[in-house]
Curated annotation (Swiss-Prot):
Keywords: Ribonucleoprotein, Ribosomal protein, RNA-binding, rRNA-binding. This is Large ribosomal subunit protein bL20. It comes from Lactiplantibacillus plantarum (strain ATCC BAA-793 / NCIMB 8826 / WCFS1) (Lactobacillus plantarum). GO terms for cellular component: ribonucleoprotein complex; ribosome. The lineage of its organism: Bacteria, Bacillati, Bacillota, Bacilli, Lactobacillales. HAMAP family: Ribosomal_bL20 (MF_00382).
Amino acid sequence: MARVKGGTVTRKRRKRILKLAKGYRGAKHIQFKVAKDQVMKSYLYAFRDRRRRKSDFRRLWIARINAAARINDISYSQLMHGLKLANVDVNRKMLADLAVNDADAFKALVDTAKKALA
């Protein structure tokens, strides 16, 4: 029986990994063994950071809301508590957008929160 070397299958598999490793520095985009390890690690980073992105954005929104709230003489925690007491159902993403792009609307929400706290 003839020996099967599997050249095309191996070449296709290696080509696929090296294509995924495009743009990596050093041997990581040239050598198959190193590229394979780096591609696997990259998938792990991507998986982890897709979950981490959610908390990163939440932290960014809170920082923006806090900065805008302190300009209006109220802390972030007091603002959120006041909005909850006033039954204003606005999430942090929307609040941060208002704080950056529409200062007047944000000021109106701050006034609503202050009235609810008083």
